[in-house]
Amino acid sequence: MNKLTIVGAGLVGEAAAQIIARDELCRELVLMDVQGELAQGKALDVWQAAVDSGSDTHVHGGAKAEMLEGSELVVITAGVPRKPGQSRQDVLSTNLPILDSIMADIKHHAPTATVLVVSNPVDVLTYRAWSVSGQGRDKVFGQAGVLDTARMKCFIAEQTGFSARDITALVLGGHGDSMVPLMRYCQIGSVPLSHFLSSEQIEQIVERTRKGGGEILGLKKTGSACDAPGVAIAQMVDAIGNGRNRILPAVAILEGEYGRTDIAMGVPCVLAEKGLARVIELPLDAQEQAMFDHSADQVARDIAEMKAL
C-alpha cells in the first residue's frame, strides 16, 4: 500500500500507527488530528521509532484535510472516548458530527479510498459512514470483532493455561453488551472448548468478553483500551494492504445475510486487496440466531436514534 491516513491522533490512532509504521504496512503514513501540532509530534515520534526498527515507512502528521489526498485507506479513530460508567452509545451525540466532518473531507480529497471506522459507537458510525459515502459495503466497514475475539482468546488462555496461539474464537453482532460469542466455534488445538471448560466457566468468559472494554476503562480510570485496538487495526490493514484474503470479523453492512438488511453488524468477512471482498454467512442454531437477532434489534434502535439527531 502506498499511502494510509489515520484520522485521530489519540491513543488508539497512535498505537495503530506505531505497528503500521514498524511493520512497514504502507510506504507513507499520515497521522491527522484537529490538534495539528499534536499529530505532528506523535508522527515524528512514531517515524523515529520505525526507523530504529529498520522500517522505511515515511510518517508525517498535521491537521489539514488536504493531507488525505492520495490515501488508499483511511482509518477513522477520531472522537471522544467513553468515560467510566458510559456506554459506547453515550458518546454518539459528540462523535457523530466529528465523523460527518471527516467523511466530508474524505469525499472531497480521497473519494476512492477504503474507509475503516474504529470510533465508537462503531456499529452506528460505520453505518453512517457508509450511508454518506456513496460507496459500496466493500469500501466502508468497521473494526470491532478482531478486538472482541482477541479478548475472548485472552480470557480462554487465562482460564485453561493453554497457549493463545492454539485458540480459535469467533464473536458476532454488535460491539457491546449484546455481542454474540459463538462458543461452538471456539476450539483449542482443534478440540472443542467444552472439552476443557464447564458451561459455567464458558459463560463467565462470555460475560467478561462482553464487558472487556469496560473492565479496562474502569481499571485505567483516565483512558480506554488502546494497545489491543491498535493491534486489531494493524491486522486489518495488513490483510487489505497485502491482499491476504484473510477471514476476519468486521462491522459490515448486511444485505440479507443472517436475515438482516440495512444494518451494520459484526460478522466474519474476507478482507482482500480492495477492502471487504465478501461476508461469510455461517449457519446458526436457534439459540444463536435468537441472540444475533437480539443484538441486531439493539443496533437497529441505535441507528434509529442516530438518524433522529
Curated annotation (Swiss-Prot):
One of its GO terms (biological process) is lactate metabolic process. GO terms for molecular function: L-lactate dehydrogenase activity; L-malate dehydrogenase (NAD+) activity. It catalyses: (S)-malate + NAD(+) = oxaloacetate + NADH + H(+). It comes from Pseudomonas putida (strain ATCC 700007 / DSM 6899 / JCM 31910 / BCRC 17059 / LMG 24140 / F1). InterPro entries: L-lactate/malate_DH, Lactate/malate_DH_C, Lactate/malate_DH_N, Lactate_DH/Glyco_Ohase_4_C, Malate_DH_type3, NAD(P)-bd_dom_sf. The lineage of its organism: Bacteria, Pseudomonadati, Pseudomonadota, Gammaproteobacteria, Pseudomonadales. PANTHER family: L-2-HYDROXYCARBOXYLATE DEHYDROGENASE (NAD(P)(+)), L-LACTATE DEHYDROGENASE. Substrate binds at residues 82, 88, 120, 151. NCBIfam families: PRK06223.1. Pfam families: Ldh_1_C, Ldh_1_N. The keyword Glycoprotein does not apply. CDD domains: LDH-like_MDH (cd01339). Gene3D superfamilies: Lactate dehydrogenase/glycoside hydrolase, family 4, C-terminal, NAD(P)-binding Rossmann-like Domain. This is Malate dehydrogenase. Catalyzes the reversible oxidation of malate to oxaloacetate. NAD(+) binds at residues 8-13, 33, 95, 118-120.
